[in-house]
Amino acid sequence: MGRVFKKKGGAKREAEDEKKEEFVIKKKAKKEKSPEPEPEPESESDDDVEDVSDEEVEDEDEDEEEQNIMDFDFEGSAPCDDDRDGIVNMLTQTFLRTDIDMKAMAESIISKAPHGLVLTQAYDDEQTEEDFMVYGLCTTLALNENKENSPKFIKDIFTYLLNRAKKGAPTEIYKKIEEIQEAGDGKTGLFVNERLLNFPTIVVPQLFESIKTDVDKFETKYKTIVYIQKLRIAEGEESNAGSSSSEAPPKKKGKMGKAEKKRAAAAALANAEIEFDNPEDRILFQLKEGKEVHFDFPVHMDVEPGSKFHTIEKEGKKYNPFRRLVIMDEKRFDAFLKKGCDSIVV
């Protein structure tokens, strides 16, 4: 047995019988050290020394490794009222220190159930606070269903995106965001794919399959998807902040204007060392189907210095936190979900 990802039972989830997935995850936990035994007197006779083979030592190591494995049960189910606070926590990983009403956004996500999935710890008859902790969230949310009567949190999301794009994105990306906001046709969705940092990626195929199944059944099909990814860029290359996928480097020498600086940053970032917090996010840029544009912006000023989401060190190199705003068409999004369904990314 290991971690089990399944549907929650009981009255809390009675309406969710269609969402059943099961798989096993194993996570290693540090075992508490036992007091070291008193040293035994050394024997002066070689006859008392027991010869231990390498195979026996390996077997002992394997036995100890098995003892260090702990089992945790997790459940994947449609968002409900009990998950509200946990969903807010997941959303704050995407939107750092913003004026967006996360609670209203969480309530909107819950109202779309049974669309979407949250990952929570399984519980039996006795419930604890940990039973209501959300470990992951995967869903979509229409960004432009009703232009005139959009909820405030939707307007705040567009304000956030436009402000970030104005500082560092090419003009066409800024205009694209404006066009999405003005359309009001419900054909643009926000893809939310959040998990606790370093949560096993074995959950991805089931999460993506659930989203793909739901989206394929929507009456109003998404034509455009907005996705905000979490990533880190190697220190020394953060000057590429605000860089984009959509422009070529300038050929002109001498003093550069704002547009040319953005092009230069875009060209430099193509060779930057990047670590994605969600490993599956890298796949999106390896696909050939459909189209996407993106730009990156730094968020280190929005993260507490001691936070696990701040700068990390890997192989002696520091990586600083960024966000990547991706705008993709339905073909790229569908291919991304399909790829995520087919394989586990590590």
Swiss-Prot record:
Bias type Basic and acidic residues, positions: 11-25
Record GO cellular component, one term: nucleus
Cysteine-cysteine disulfides: none
InterPro entries noted in UniProt: BCP1_family
UniProt superkingdom: Eukaryota
Disordered: annotated span: 1-83, 238-260
Bias-annotated ranges (Acidic residues): 37-83
Biased composition (Basic residues): 1-10
Composition bias, Low complexity: 239-248
Family per record: Belongs to the BCP1 family.
Protein's recorded name: Protein BCCIP homolog
Organism: Caenorhabditis briggsae
Source organism phylogeny: Eukaryota, Metazoa, Ecdysozoa, Nematoda, Chromadorea
